[in-house]
């Protein structure tokens, strides 16, 4: 923990392990909120995870993986330029399962009856299967939909693009 590092390096006069939440640079996009404690108004507020925000971030990351921007098996950006090579967009293995980057860079955000095999809701279900396993796929998809308050299909068709753009605007 931070306190131990401060002591090991003799930085007690320079640093404190106590950091106000508003100075933490992660978790600043609505992932958490502070709510009154059950102990009353005078008690310290309790940190609450906003699962809907976290699920929306997971979906945006998953779409990034589908498009090749990120890879499941490597940290950082993968394809960050307009002309990827065949090697960069080649399928790869993750947890022993084959993962494919979208071949044309277009993910339809449409209802399931649209006829496109790379439709975003279908790709999302496959992403969940590959990342978290087939055994828990239905449970995980149900949880995601519960957090969103709608089906993945409804989310992709109606809200994904708006939420995704908002996430990356400064």
Task: Tell me the role of every PLM-derived stretch.
Residues 3-6, 14-170:
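Terminal accessory regions of large proteins
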């Amino acid at each position: 923990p931070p306190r131990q590092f401060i002591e090991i390096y003799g930085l007690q006069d320079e640093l404190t392990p106590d950091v106000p939440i508003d100075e933490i640079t992660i978790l600043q996009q609505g992932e958490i909120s502070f709510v009154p404690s059950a102990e009353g108004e005078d008690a310290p507020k309790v940190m609450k995870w906003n699962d809907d925000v976290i699920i929306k971030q997971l979906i945006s990351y998953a779409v990034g993986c589908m498009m090749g921007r990120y890879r499941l098996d490597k940290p950082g950006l993968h394809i960050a330029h307009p002309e990827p090579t065949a090697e960069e967009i080649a399928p790869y293995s993750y947890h022993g399962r084959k993962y494919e980057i979208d071949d044309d860079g277009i993910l339809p955000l449409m209802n399931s009856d649209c006829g496109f095999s790379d439709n975003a809701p279908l790709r999302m279900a496959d992403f969940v299967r590959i990342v978290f396993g087939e055994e828990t796929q239905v449970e995980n998809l149900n949880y995601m939909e519960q957090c969103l308050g709608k089906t993945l299909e409804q989310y992709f068709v109606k809200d994904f693009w708006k939420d995704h753009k908002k996430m990356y605007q400064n």
